[in-house]
């Protein structure tokens, strides 16, 4: 009989080891980036946390206690990451900014009013190509709806977006130069 984990993340990670305790995410919790390449993934995560909690975490390159620390370390497979959450903070390691973003999307799903559960998560995709399509040739979608769709793809670690723009003479993108 399989043990049911209290940690629910979509898609299901390769490995989840639960531990006792939680890390309290507060307005003073910084996101420490150990490489400037990680600034954009950190900004995306900070925006998501702001939407969930109402406060925007600061992004810094200076080590700090009780922080979310992002490390680029060679040796991981493409898009593979390791996330370790303890009572004292969160460490996320991977070899690419894309893999760090995947780890941050997992961390985003772990955030709750009770805090971030202590755990170790190791994950990598089973398939290199994970895609989804949006067909705007048959139905109109407002720009904000398309952006929300892309954000949801990112949250679920989908790495290819197929945007079906047209089936025939109908063109759904405004081009100022041509009528």
Language model region names:
Residues 42-43, 143-147:
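Conserved strand-to-helix beginnings and helix N-cap segments that scaffold or border functional pockets
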Residues 93-94, 130-143:
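The substrate-binding groove and active-site-proximal loops of carbohydrate-active enzymes
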Residues 39, 100, 140-142, 171:
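Residue-level signal for secondary-structure boundary sites
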Residues 145-168:
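Catalytic domains of carbohydrate-active enzymes, especially glycoside hydrolases
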Residues 107-110, 135, 140, 152, ...:
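Mid-sequence acidic-hydrophobic segments that form the walls
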């Amino acid at each position: 009989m399989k043990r049911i984990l209290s940690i629910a993340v979509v898609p299901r990670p390769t490995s989840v080891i639960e531990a006792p305790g939680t890390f309290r995410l507060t307005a003073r919790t910084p996101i420490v980036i150990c490489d400037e390449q990680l600034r954009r993934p950190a900004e995306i995560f900070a925006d998501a946390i702001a939407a969930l909690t109402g406060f925007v975490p600061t992004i810094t390159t200076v080590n700090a206690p009780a922080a979310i620390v992002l490390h680029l370390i060679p040796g991981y497979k493409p898009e593979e990451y390791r996330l370790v959450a303890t009572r004292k903070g969160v460490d996320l390691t991977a070899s690419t900014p894309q893999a760090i973003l995947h780890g941050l999307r997992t961390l985003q799903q772990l955030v709750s009013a009770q805090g971030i559960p202590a755990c170790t998560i190791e994950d990598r995709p089973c398939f290199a190509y994970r895609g989804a399509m949006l067909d705007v040739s048959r139905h109109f979608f407002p720009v904000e709806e398309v952006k929300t769709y892309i954000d949801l793809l990112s949250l679920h670690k989908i790495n290819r977006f197929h945007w079906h723009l047209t089936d025939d003479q109908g063109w759904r993108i405004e081009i100022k130069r041509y009528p």
